Amino acid sequence: MAYSCAVQAASPAPLSAPRELTPRGIALGIALALILGAANAYLGLYAGLTVSASIPAAVISMALLRMAGGATILENNLVQAIASAGEAVAAGSIFTFPALIILGHKGPLPYLQVTALSAAGGTMGALLVVFLRRAYIVDDRLPFPEGFACAEVLRAGENRSQMAPLAWGGAIAAGLKAAQDVFGIVPGMISGARWLGGAVIGGSINISGALLGIGYIVGLRIATLVFAGGAFAWMVAIPVLALLHGGGQNPDPMRAASALWSSQVRYLGVGAMLTGGIVTLWRLRKRIFAALRDSLAIVSGSHVQVVAREETDLSPRAIVSAVGLTVPVIFTLCLMLGAGVALSAALALMLALIGFFATAIAGYLTGIVGASNNPVSGVTVIVLLAVAIFLKLAGVESVGVGPRLAILSGAVVCTAAAMAGDSLHDLATGYFVGATPRALEIGVLIGAIAASFVMAPILNLLIAGYGIAGTATSRAGALAAPQAFLIAKVTQAVFRGGLPWTTIASGAMLAALLAAGDVLAERFGSSWRAPIMPVAIGLYLPFGLSVTIFIGALTGGWLGQEKEGGPRLLFAAGMVAGEALMGVATGALVTAGVSLPVL
């Protein structure tokens, strides 16, 4: 089912013998992957979010390669693809490995385990999505808002006439971000809540140029569904739970509402994403099976297919071989952690299978809300639940060994999910500018492997320098690591009890009802459709993000459609780019020891 959105994928511009995968581009991409990966590791531990590195890397690449001379748009695109892989590996690492510290791990994080598991997850995520590229980008035409924005930045670098609206949008969003994070004179969010009898009702709005731009790019239909999920969470679920569970015990209504959201309502989104992932894979089953069938035929040598450069992927034989190497790596590490041979083998195979499921979900979500807003932690919670339950059924009851095995196993799939979203985002950018998928797939894999080798030292430096709040490592200015705390909490809850299974099941049932309604609407030819995933995202993400995305989409609906590359779309893309650049710059200032805000 194709999405109707503000932006539709353009046909890639054919180029003959393009200058794309070059030694200097690879070297620059790796350097940026390490730098931006480190910056995002800090941001993720500090604030629980990461910024897509694609646009900052594209801007840096255009500036440096222009000075060197002879650069092409495809070479710059390849650089940003390699660089953004470092950010994706950082996202997977910061959400999981610090959870070991929270659970009581002493000393530095083990280099071999972090490196091997990050590399295994990065390889899975970078390559498994090759089988989904055509289904998501070409056939379903998901908007990939940040992929579109990055493509517009690259095009503007080639065509200076497009630079003005892009620059204005970027300057306004960057200025707003600086006013918030650097100078502290503008709030990043406005929120409020009030008691209505025993119920509490509240809401928030994020003040963000990037989110407004994303809303404009994805269009009113998708943004409305995301907003509907958030509105249901805050206007229905939270008030009802407050009535049932006595939310009035907390005198501050906003604190009470936020506590209910984080401890209960957010798990509605987890359940909904689980059902949504299953439904999405079921709907795409024919396309996926066709891609796998053709791939197996190519591997066996019984089928040879000639395709255009813009449709050339890595060979299925290479993909199967590379992903296959991750299985013995995971098996060996599980053995080292004390699991038996049978359990280690079962875990390795299970993670390979779950890896494809997680990459499919994460890639789809990125296509809707962009790489920066991809709810990787939600996908990781689903994986952790599956792994932890499997370990309990296998007899691993120890609250020490069980959670550790679950977290390290989940780290593989978490990194794969983050990498999948990034990889499809890069492939979407490549589709918009006429790049070769095969070159991008190689580049993303290079960036993922390179970043994996430095993740353990980066994490250990940050933990040694700042510590993690609420643990034995904590000190002044300790890192909050909110996603790692979520992962640790969920894992412990499976082994010790206390996970809100009823809420998770309710989210899954709600999504099933939506799916049934969508099937009926399709059968009767209705133009009203409600796919699950956008609603699930709204249930899981903070409401303020959904509200701002919705406002951006409303603005686009009010102004009306415009042709691809129009000034308003360029302005929206510039807002996404400007905030991303300022976010990285702010992270660099904080990492350098500058105390923010300065006022």
Task: Pin down the residues of each PLM region.
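Alpha-helical multipass membrane-protein architecture
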Residues: 2-599
